[in-house]
């Protein structure tokens, strides 16, 4: 997991897509959430940033599950596992898309740490949650995020399970339409309205 993006990129700086109104944050181990994040980024032409654990997860599935259980137990005690990703400022973003895998019903631990660390900076932002899972629901993880980021507002969520991943493109497009998120809205300054007057007629053109 982890994708093809340049690992040398400063983790404090989102990878620019359009530097507009939207930011896609994601963590992913098997690649499902990453594919969702990339689809959203490509549709909106927006910035994207991977939230990475300080220590990479084991390639062995059972080893990863054991570590996930340990980290979830630690979080319940208020101890968040270290990550190497941070964002200085969310000031330019209207919607922050937050993507994660669901582990044992909970949000993947790297993203829990990120939101815990950035809760005050996300106050007042709209957060759009999307997640992937084998079969688990999303509701418990939504409750976790609402507790972590109590100052934010939340949109409708998107969950893809192993049985619906093949519908990813259509599901994401429908979801983004529901949110009113589009490439055009991400770059509102790219449209220019020009009034053209000919005699007593005035025509407004969008360029």
How would you name each of these model-derived features?
Residues 197-205:
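Short, solvent-exposed loop/edge segments of extracellular or virion-exposed proteins
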Residues 58-67:
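Hydrolase active-site cap/lid region
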Residues 6-23, 27-54, 67-188:
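FMN-binding flavodoxin-like domain, especially the glycine-rich phosphate-binding loop
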Residues 191-193:
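Short loop/turn and low-complexity linker motifs enriched in small/turn-promoting residues
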């Amino acid at each position: 997991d982890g994708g093809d993006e340049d690992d040398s990129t400063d983790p404090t700086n989102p990878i620019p897509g359009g530097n507009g109104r939207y930011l896609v944050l994601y963590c992913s181990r098997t690649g499902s959430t990453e594919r969702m994040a990339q689809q959203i980024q490509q549709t909106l032409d927006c910035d994207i940033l991977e939230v990475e654990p300080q220590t990479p997860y084991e390639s062995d599935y059972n080893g990863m599950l054991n570590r996930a259980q340990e980290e979830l137990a630690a979080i319940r005690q208020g101890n968040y596992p270290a990550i190497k990703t941070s964002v200085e400022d969310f000031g330019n973003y209207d919607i922050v898309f937050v993507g994660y895998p669901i582990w044992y019903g909970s949000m993947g631990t790297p993203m829990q740490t990120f939101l815990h660390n950035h809760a005050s900076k996300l106050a007042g932002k709209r957060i759009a949650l999307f997640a992937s899972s084998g079969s688990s629901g999303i509701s418990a993880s939504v409750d976790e995020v609402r507790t972590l980021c109590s100052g934010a507002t939340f949109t409708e969520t998107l969950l893809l399970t192993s049985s619906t991943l093949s519908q990813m493109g259509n599901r994401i497009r429908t979801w983004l339409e529901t949110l009113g998120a589009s490439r055009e809205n991400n770059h509102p300054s790219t449209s220019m309205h020009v009034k053209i007057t000919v005699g007593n007629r005035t025509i407004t053109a969008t360029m």
